[in-house]
């Protein structure tokens, strides 16, 4: 990530940051799986997969969610199964990293009683006492067959590390300062000897995690190392492998499974969990040069019509950025078709608009089309908020459109790239700072273990954080890659390619193309999940109950990179059949919200599907063309895919 300086922007907090249970010196961890534990009047449950965790009046409680499936939802809420009371009055987060968070439990005077470490990908929860104390348990643990365990919520939990400290009929732990206790739930279908193996590995509880990634032509690699304190390097602990991580190496699995809201998870031992995802190539131009003359003529006429009908762009960061990206796509078509009378003024207009947004002092002079630096929450925020962007919601969606437009328009214009860089680099750092620092957290929105981003800034929800439009997240990283290329930053481009490919894999694994035969989600009645939370997945959106919205929000904005959504043609058709108002063959069926986006998605099922969609697109009602799209781009997409 290039050096950035937030102080070049006006300093302003557009909305107050909620109460934060955070030690001084830590950058506020917005957009994290654990943000609800940090922000707000009271700590909310969080979901360090596969566990669920909540702070309680005297300490904490945790459990393994019992996944329940309905027609509309896959539910895995926080239900306390094991509780630990140490007389705590409050909690405060003292550290966080790639996949772990550590919180101190404090007494009424603010003194530390002990610390809990929560780790994504680990079923082991560890508590370390900071004083001599007795921890009261809500269930009685006892030794059976060489293991100390208890039944809770229909599940057996194993206690590791402090079995000899049990007292009070197994409901108390007498801990000395520095003593640790760890618990894990026994997996389903654990073979003989597996629980003993897991207990031995759980004796090496995780103290922190680190991230490494690699980018190759055909795949990207994500590797999370689970550090175990003073243990020798490489000591294995218990890890959990989710469906998107199946192409993994370095883990010993076959130790049982857990049902999670994301599907069946494999229980393994490893010191590093590494997996690959198919590489997705960044793309900023839909290549129409190979189209026939008739198609080019039709397209040229439509480009002229759309260019002449452009209206002033909105001034907020979502719709304003989306309009810039839309017009960048129109510019790319006009230039390929040799329409200089359209392309030259449109390029000038886009360059001027981008320069206006990128004026560092813009918000000192106007109330729109500019950015400020919020020094309290450490974020760059658009002066005209939308969808809660002043509360850190959806920044990657919004800023991805700006980065995309800048990457396209400045691709062959170094002077423009240089003018935009001070502010565009800040937008990039806000959502994707690689290392983190005093100004921004590392990878603010992206969860490396989950393989996808989180959209809510403060996550004030009992079901954890969430993300709806996984496709806009993918598009954001595509935009980041294009901007990195245009600004000559090879390191940032490599990081963006990793983010792009990883998010695309998880988007398919949990939003659009998940395994419908996975027994963990048996009974779910839909082909997509349009809202993925820490503790559930829903066939629902924030804005509409229309079936077309459920799929449309998972495919827009259908940028040139959207080919990652292709795969099984029958799955694409099944997803569409659920979303449309009638048979795919009937043009009226596409007269729905996001009808244009669904037509473009249909083209990914094959050339015949694209040709059929093209016929319908020509007469699709104008109000069904999304505000981030034009009929020109819609037709061009379908023409290109029909000719493939």
Region spans (language model):
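Ser/Thr/Asn(+Pro)-rich, low-complexity disordered segments
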Residues: 1-384, 388-389, 394, 434, ...
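Aromatic-rich carbohydrate-recognition surfaces in CAZymes
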Residues: 314-334, 389-428, 469-477
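Short sequence/structural elements of tandem HEAT/ARM alpha-solenoid repeats
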Residues: 344-348, 418-423, 494
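Active-site lining segments of carbohydrate-active enzymes
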Residues: 354-390, 404, 408-415, 423-464
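A compositional/structural signature marking long, glycine- and acidic/polar-rich segments
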Residues: 425-532
């Amino acid at each position: 990530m290039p050096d950035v300086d937030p102080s070049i922007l006006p300093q302003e907090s557009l909305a107050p940051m909620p109460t934060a249970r955070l030690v001084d010196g830590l950058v506020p961890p917005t957009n994290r799986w654990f943000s609800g534990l940090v922000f707000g009047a009271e700590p909310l449950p969080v979901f360090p997969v596969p566990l669920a965790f909540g702070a309680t009046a005297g300490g904490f409680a945790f459990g393994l969610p019992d996944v329940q499936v309905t027609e509309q939802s896959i539910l895995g809420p926080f239900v306390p199964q094991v509780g630990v009371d140490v007389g705590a009055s409050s909690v405060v987060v003292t550290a966080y990293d790639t996949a772990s968070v550590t919180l101190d439990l404090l007494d009424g005077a603010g003194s530390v009683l002990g610390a809990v470490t929560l780790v994504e990908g680990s079923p082991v929860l560890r508590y370390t006492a900071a004083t001599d104390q007795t921890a009261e348990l809500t269930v009685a643990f006892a030794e059976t067959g060489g293991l100390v365990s208890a039944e809770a919520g229909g599940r057996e939990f194993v206690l590791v590390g402090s079995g000899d400290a049990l007292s009070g009929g197994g409901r108390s732990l007498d801990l000395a300062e520095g003593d640790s206790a760890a618990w894990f739930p026994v997996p389903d279908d654990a073979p003989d000897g597996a629980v003993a193996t897991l207990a031995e590995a759980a004796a090496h509880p995780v103290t922190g995690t680190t991230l490494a990634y690699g980018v190759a032509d055909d795949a990207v690699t994500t590797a999370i190392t689970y550090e175990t304190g003073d243990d020798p390097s490489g000591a294995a602990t218990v890890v959990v492998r989710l469906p998107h991580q199946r192409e993994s190496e370095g883990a010993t699995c076959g130790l049982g499974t857990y049902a999670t809201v994301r599907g069946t998870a494999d229980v393994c031992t490893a010191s590093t969990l590494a997996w690959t995802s198919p590489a997705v190539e960044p793309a900023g131009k839909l290549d129409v040069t190979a189209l026939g003359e008739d198609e080019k003529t039709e397209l040229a006429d439509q480009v002229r019509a759309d260019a002449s009908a452009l209206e002033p762009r909105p001034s907020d960061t979502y719709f304003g950025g989306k309009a810039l990206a839309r017009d960048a796509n129109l510019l790319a078509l006009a230039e390929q078709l040799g329409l200089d009378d359209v392309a030259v003024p449109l390029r000038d207009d886009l360059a001027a608009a981008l320069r206006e947004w990128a004026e560092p002092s813009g918000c000192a002079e106007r109330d729109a089309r500019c950015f400020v630096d919020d020094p309290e929450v450490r974020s760059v925020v658009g002066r005209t908020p939308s969808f809660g962007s002043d509360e850190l919601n959806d920044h990657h969606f919004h800023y991805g459109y700006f980065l995309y437009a800048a990457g396209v328009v400045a691709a062959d214009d170094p002077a423009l790239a240089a003018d935009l860089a001070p502010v565009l680099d800040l937008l990039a750092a806000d959502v994707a700072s690689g290392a983190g620092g005093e100004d921004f957290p590392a990878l603010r929105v992206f969860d490396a273990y989950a393989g996808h981003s989180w959209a809510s800034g403060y996550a004030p929800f009992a079901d954890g954080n969430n993300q709806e439009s996984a496709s806009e997240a993918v598009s954001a990283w595509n935009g980041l890659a294009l901007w990195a290329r245009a600004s000559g930053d090879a390191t940032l481009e490599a990081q963006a390619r990793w983010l792009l490919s990883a998010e695309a894999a998880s988007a398919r694994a949990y939003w659009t193309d998940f395994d419908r035969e996975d027994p963990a989600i048996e009974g779910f009645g839909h082909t997509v999940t349009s809202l993925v939370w820490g503790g559930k997945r829903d066939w629902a959106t924030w804005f509409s109950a229309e079936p077309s919205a459920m799929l449309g929000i998972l495919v827009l904005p259908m940028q040139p990179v959207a080919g990652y959504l292709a795969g099984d043609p029958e799955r694409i058709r099944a997803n569409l059949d659920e979303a449309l108002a009638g048979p795919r063959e009937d043009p009226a069926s596409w007269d729905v919200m996001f009808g244009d986006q669904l037509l473009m998605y249909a083209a990914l099922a094959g050339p015949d599907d694209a040709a059929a969609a093209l016929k319908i697109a020509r007469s699709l009602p104008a109000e069904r063309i999304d505000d981030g799209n034009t009929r020109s781009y819609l037709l061009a997409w379908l023409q290109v895919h029909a000719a493939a």
